[in-house]
A protein has these predicted regions:
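N-terminal low-complexity, intrinsically disordered segments
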Residues: 1-52
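Short acidic-glycine loop/turn motifs at beta-strand connectors
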Residues: 18, 62, 120-123, 134-135, ...
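Generic non-transmembrane alpha-helical segments
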Residues: 36-40, 44, 90-98, 193-201
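Short glycine-enriched loops at secondary-structure junctions
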Residues: 52-58, 63-64
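DPxDG-like acidic metal-binding loop motif
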Residues: 61-71, 136-137, 141
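Contiguous, small/hydrophobic- and glycine-enriched helical/loop subdomains that border
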Residues: 64-108
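Long, positively charged amphipathic alpha-helical accessory segments at protein N-termini or as interdomain linkers
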Residues: 98-100, 129, 136-227
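Beta-rich nucleic-acid/ligand-interaction surfaces
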Residues: 104-125
């Protein structure tokens, strides 16, 4: 995001298979139970990190897709809601193309609640997005839970208990549970469907993170580790 906003890199989209982690938000970090929540995440086999944007703790693991879209914009604040709407709509369309009854909107009782969550049947949350803006650009990030809904539930029950946040574990869903096809192919199918939707608006070109970007990421990493 920093390099895109500074004009050093073009607009960049990344869809990745992340590590196993609970990504805490700034609101979580100032909650009285934060230290206990971090310990609960680690006890469940999840690393604890501080996220760029978003309302409350969310889960990443190897059956999820981590989305990061960095966009140059001289007036990023003006486009906050339009970027949320567009990205949430894109994810819902991608999932509908696979046969999921995907909708945009908050499911009552969901974790990390938000009006731009993507759900199935208005019953279970499948994806969430957050946004960070800086001078010169914005970053829209998100997580799509393709499989392993039980892993999300298992770790967030003690984490949310420590943070004293209400939520209904039954609202944590996964795309593979909404599909009739092979779960083993679901991750690639969802990724490709998302790329196809981005491709309707952008000319996508494969790329790799250069060494300067990776070096910057290493320097910034300590800022995302819980104290």
């Amino acid at each position: 995001m920093q390099r895109v906003a500074a004009g050093e890199l073009p607009q960049t989209l990344r869809l990745a298979r992340p590590g196993t982690m609970v990504a805490f938000a700034k609101q979580d970090a100032v909650a009285p139970g934060y230290a206990d929540a971090v310990r609960a995440a680690r006890a469940g086999g999840f690393a604890a990190v501080l996220r760029l944007a978003g309302g409350r703790a969310a889960v990443f693991h190897d059956q999820t897709i981590a989305l990061a879209h960095a966009v140059p914009d001289p007036e990023p604040r003006a486009g906050i809601h339009s970027r949320f709407e567009w990205t949430a709509g894109l994810l819902a369309r991608a999932l509908r193309s696979l046969g999921v009854e995907a909708r945009v909107g908050e499911v009552p009782g969901e974790y990390c609640p938000g009006g731009y969550s993507v759900n199935a049947r208005r019953e279970v949350k499948l994806a969430g997005i957050g946004q960070r803006i800086v001078a010169g650009g914005s970053h829209v990030g998100g997580v799509i839970v393709v499989g392993g809904a039980e892993r999300v539930r298992d770790v967030l029950v003690p984490v949310y208990r420590a943070l004293e946040l209400p939520w209904d574990p039954g609202t944590a869903g996964a795309v593979e549970n909404e599909l009739n096809g092979s779960p083993s192919r679901a991750w690639t199918a969802v990724r490709d469907a998302i790329l196809a939707e981005y491709g309707r608006r952008y000319d996508l070109v494969d790329g790799e993170l250069d060494e300067e970007t990776l070096a910057l990421a290493r320097r910034l990493a300590p800022e995302h580790r819980p104290a």
